[in-house]
């Protein structure tokens, strides 16, 4: 999605449609949806719930696609992917972004799985990357190696 489409779909047309549905159904409709593609994480940070659940909880690509498809029908074009570590499912997220080019996907990530291939534009996709690098503080990580990896990833 290019910036102009993001502004139009996510912040103007989509927002106006969400407001229309709020009035029509007399309920609060979100303008952004958050979902966790996976509970898996490559780090084990102190205090983080993901370390307790391991990698058992995963949304299938079909479930993620259904969430976005139904959200778009409601005028929602902004999706925040958290986890676990969402880049553990980066291929599915690339596929999702390529399929839903009128939506934007914001990844809340520790950044340690971002490599050169991740940063290259995807063929057939107009998506631009929106990342929030969650680096935390050194004392929050369970190991010095995890802290260094997270701190140097960006």
Regions found by a protein language model. Give the residues of each.
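Short, contiguous clusters of charged residues that form electrostatic/catalytic patches at enzyme active sites
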Residues: 13-17, 62, 66, 152
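Short cysteine/histidine-rich metal-coordination sites, predominantly Zn2+-binding motifs
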Residues: 41, 59-68
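Short glycine-enriched, charge-decorated loop/helix-capping segments at active-site entrances
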Residues: 50-58, 143-149
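Secondary-structure boundary/capping motif
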Residues: 56, 88-89
């Amino acid at each position: 999605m290019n910036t102009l489409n993001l502004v139009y779909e996510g912040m103007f047309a989509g927002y106006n449609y969400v407001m229309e549905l709020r009035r029509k159904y007399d309920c609060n409709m979100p303008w952004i949806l958050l979902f966790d593609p996976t509970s898996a994480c490559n780090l084990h940070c102190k205090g983080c719930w993901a370390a307790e659940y391991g990698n058992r909880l995963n949304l299938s690509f079909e479930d993620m696609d259904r969430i976005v498809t139904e959200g778009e029908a409601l005028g929602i074009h902004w999706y925040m992917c958290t986890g676990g570590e969402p880049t553990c499912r980066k291929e599915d997220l690339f596929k999702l972004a390529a399929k839903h080019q009128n939506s934007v996907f914001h990844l809340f990530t520790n950044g340690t799985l971002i490599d050169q291939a991740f940063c290259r534009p995807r063929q057939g996709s107009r998506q631009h990357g929106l990342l929030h690098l969650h680096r935390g503080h050194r004392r929050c990580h369970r190991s010095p190696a995890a802290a260094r990896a997270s701190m140097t990833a960006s």
